Amino acid sequence: MAKTKKNIGKKILLGIFIAAVAIAVIATVVNFGVYKSLLKKGSEYNKVEIENQLVPEKDENDNWYFTTDGDLKVMHLTDIHIGGGWMSYGKDLKTLNAVATMVTREKPDLVVATGDIAYPVFFQAGTFNNYSGAKIFANLMETLGVYWTVTFGNHDAEAYSYFDREAVAKIYSDEDFKHAMNFVAYAAK
């Protein structure tokens, strides 16, 4: 009888383990689909047409600057909180739309996003993946065609997130992002 109880206990533990693995696999597949869908959505917006758009230049020390005798219009965004997971999908769509609408209407020369672009908080986003939120935001900004830069906030590289600051910095300093004005020390390592 003791052996039977032991076998039942092992079977229960095995069942729990298999269920946990199945849930993890399903969540991974669903979150990847959400990520691809949000990237696609971010690519569907129209490029912002800015009359007499200022074009930044770099000095001999690789510092960005604008030259103008007129106004420099800067838009400041913060706490964008793109979760990039199945639990935040609806909110993320609204966030992309809000950012695109503000940038399109205001037509800034530069957008400065000061932290918390990603929000990989599992119980709200359904993922710990902070890469997704960063990549989705960068993709949106490039689609809009405005110059942009970022700083990190506490949620962009949480201790429990999949990717560290260096990995996220590499996203923002990708050479394919022609409008990104990011000097990121982490990317040089």
Predicted regions and their residues:
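Intrinsic low-complexity, intrinsically disordered segments enriched in polar/basic residues
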Residues: 3-6, 129, 160
